[in-house]
Curated annotation (Swiss-Prot):
Name of the protein in its database record: FAD-linked oxidoreductase malF
Organism encoding this protein: Malbranchea aurantiaca
Function: FAD-linked oxidoreductase; part of the gene cluster that mediates the biosynthesis of malbrancheamide, a dichlorinated fungal indole alkaloid that belongs to a family of natural products containing a characteristic bicyclo[2.2.2]diazaoctane core. The first step of malbrancheamide biosynthesis involves coupling of L-proline and L-tryptophan by malG, a bimodular NRPS, to produce L-Pro-L-Trp aldehyde through reductive offloading.
Pfam families named in the record: BBE (PF08031), FAD_binding_4 (PF01565)
Listed GO MF terms: FAD binding; oxidoreductase activity
EC annotation from Swiss-Prot or TrEMBL: 1.-.-.-
Top-level taxonomic group: Eukaryota
Amino acid sequence: MKYTATFALLILAIGIQTQRRSTICRCRQEDACWPTTAEWSSLNQSIDGKLRHLRPVGLPCQQSAYHKEKCDEVLAMTHNSSWRVDHPESLQLVSWESWPEKNQSCQIVREAVDGCAQGRIPLYSAAVESTKQVQQAVSFAKHRNLRLVVRNTGHDMAGRSSAPGSLQILTSGLKGINYTENFVPFITQGSAEPMGPAVTIGAGILTGELYATGSEKGFVVLGGACSTVGIAGGFIQSGGMGILSPSKGLGSDHVLQVEIVTADGSHIIANQYQNEDLFWAVRGGGGGTFGVITSVTLRAFADLPATVTGIQINTPSADAIFWAGVKTVLSILPELTDAGNSARMIVLPASSTGGASASFEGYTFNKKGAVSLLALQRALDDFGIPFKLSHDFQGNLSRFLAAPKGVDLAGISVIPGSVFLSYDLVASKDGPAKVTSALSDLRLGPGSSFSVDAFGGGQVVNNKNRINSAVHPDWRSALLSLTVGRGVPPGYTLETLKSIESELENDQLPRLRSLEGGRKGAYLAVAYPNEVYFQDSFWGKNYDRLLKVKRAWDPEDLFITRVGVGSERWDDEGMCTRADSGLWHALARF
């Protein structure tokens, strides 16, 4: 882009003026602007007594505040995802409850003596159960300049559901499931075309709850594998991949309408007929960024049978035989997804006992898929790779998906990082070998793993010219979403955390990106939370348009998240603007 001399001088002038401005901060608890007790009481009254003062979930186990019965419950349930959904003072990844930069944490250890600090846990939670209550909470935060976060089930892996000194809007209480045979979008003038079977859900409906209803009524939706994820929250706002993606597309491809409370407290309906810019943005533009979604209408499909094939590879170490098994699995994924089938493989190259394991699960809906998996079994046999095989025929896919799968991990500390791998790479002659070589070079130790999700290709790619949404364009050429999960040891120090982050950011993720010559897109739901070039990694060429939508609907950044749209203007916790934010704000207008 070429700038005129006049424009260059204008930019320089703006920059000089910016340096003279003070940093803008949200109101903090120690500030005079912090709401009084009476004002918090007024908010509580306006939302029908749903305001909660939050303290860390581990507090009852601290020596200074020890409560045996409550501590017993915390210790027994800390790894239970459903329990954490119901406790707004907790998150699924406990690493986001702590604030290591300030040495603030609250260990879940009986009679802990190291103290218990608030960390990143919000100070208050508005446990809303209606749109009106959401509006009241949003308006309260806006008019008092509070740091606001949106939490549904607490699954967010990049820390977007928590922030120090904040007010939380808890949406898990927004329930309701309404199935219709022929959904008609809302329109203010004229008439809209019916769109076929659909289901409208409250933001707090869990994936497992929706699958269970689908099992009863004979429909299935495109959701994820974790039964405790709020499907209307971060799932669809991150794009949403699932086992039906190769045959149907992404979850966000099938969002027909959303209801959302925006930064000015308005209740908005967005679909293809009205508020189209907002409708485009929330389908892949990131959760907690454009407002509080209160309900979503999803396209529903007829329920169907499926066969789940499990292949377990265990070896004493991650030796040549083990990696040959991984390569063999990778080689069949293109043809598997071509036919609308899918698969996931979770790999632990090293365990505490020294063994290595690869757990493969294939989801087939047709004869072609069965043939592909039979070929995989024969190839493993031919290479002398030991494995255990299981088959599970499911006459009702929704019923199978409704049951917990053991993937709802909770009460753990993990730093994720992900990258898309294209169909062309994996389907090429040397592709599986190149990918396997890169994976074996990651040098993952005990407590760390990677997952290979073959949820791209097929209809995800075919929807490139059919669906106009904010998801990263690389989705439309991707076959795999590859996610590295680095385990963080209990009681970790800031130094340990930074060391793990450095390895992931400067070595492991670059190795994977180098497979295709540089930066590739990443799945927003499991992406690296400190991504420097997050704009490109999460949204690519869509970012500029997303930023314009953000400026139009939330010009003061009431809704801001870590590595979210517009977050480059703010510090990591979204509490204060950066020194150069005035220049950034000015440039955003051009």
